[in-house]
Amino acid sequence: MCIRDRVGAEKAAQNPNHQGDEEYNYFMAVCFPAEQLTIIDYNRVVKDLNGLTPQAFLEALKKNFVVEEKGTDIYKPAALHNFSLYLEGKWYSLTAKPGTYDDNDPIGVLDVTISSNLILDEILGIKDLRSDKRIDFVGGIRGLGELKKRVDSGEMKMALALYPVSMKQLMDLSLIHI
């Protein structure tokens, strides 16, 4: 039973005059072709490196990522499993190594899961993204310049930009029952 059915049944049980044509029996939906939709990135900024020096942090990343320095010009992630890191005035490309994610797991294959597990949790010790005060989120509509600004201001120590979720990934997620 989906949420709409449960809510409708609950409302019907609360209504002694239920007829079946009440508004709660309907669910408004809209459909768009997938190729007409755009999903934007959702990025992270972090206040500290969990006691690591920038060099030690970069070294720790190499366990699960291919790390390439990209210079001072803003670097946008190029594909799924590629991340942009901004640290101490430089941009880096981080590409998840094969075997660090499972292509058959619709949640485990997501860049948000990869970055949360292998960077934020494993290296930076951020276990709960919702409550940890050391992390903040920056919507992609604000651009990667906002990430750079927040790090350069000293407010944050590093920024991590993610490639947007693909439409296929979103559709795959919609098919699982969590």
Predicted regions and their residues:
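Surface-exposed, charge/polar-rich loops and edge strands
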Residues: R4-I176
